[in-house]
Amino acid sequence: MMWCAPLRCSTTVSYTHLKEVFIILQQAWTARDWTPIRPFEKEELFRMHEAQLREYVRLGRINVVERINVNQAYLHLYRRDAQYEYLTIYMAVRMGDYIIDEKTREVLKGDPNREYDMRYLLTFTRRLGITTREAGGAACACCPNCGAPMHITNAGQCEYCGSDITTGDFDWVLSNLDSVKPETRLDERGVVIDPPQ
């Protein structure tokens, strides 16, 4: 069994890592296999996406998301409260997005030959004071607590040490994902430090 080497830590976050998480999420959505995204999503968001995906499976549909190109990603908002830090990342993305029947492959919605420009706000959360592990990006599949190969239970725990790694206690986890519509008013405050309770 191969274990990950000790990693250096940082108080910063990598935009490359955050983009990778977004792309892994889209690929898992198309594959209708939510397992790959488990280490990167907070419990509540994971359960919501899992339920949405089960509904696609129940209906016999596949939401195909392909040719994903993150054109722009920047820190839109940083917020901190007494326990957690929150990064809201703005992403401008161009990608194919359509729905097909799983058996006939007939296109039910959208156009497989067209790409759409979409905007998202992704909120990542981690416990205050935690440092980010420097590694090979989102593809690094090691437990942030014990360094064991990443095998996560359905409850979001490391199979080896039992640590719940999807809470933000070890690293940034995706806690919210919103599509930005033309009528969406963006919070332009930048940095928000809530007073300690």
Which sequence ranges carry the predicted segments?
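Amphipathic alpha-helical repeat scaffolds
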Residues: K19-Q26, P144
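Conserved small/polar residues in nucleotide/adenosyl-binding loops
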Residues: V13-H17
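Short metal-coordination and nucleic-acid-contact micro-motifs, chiefly zinc-binding Cys/His arrays
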Residues: G136-C140, N154
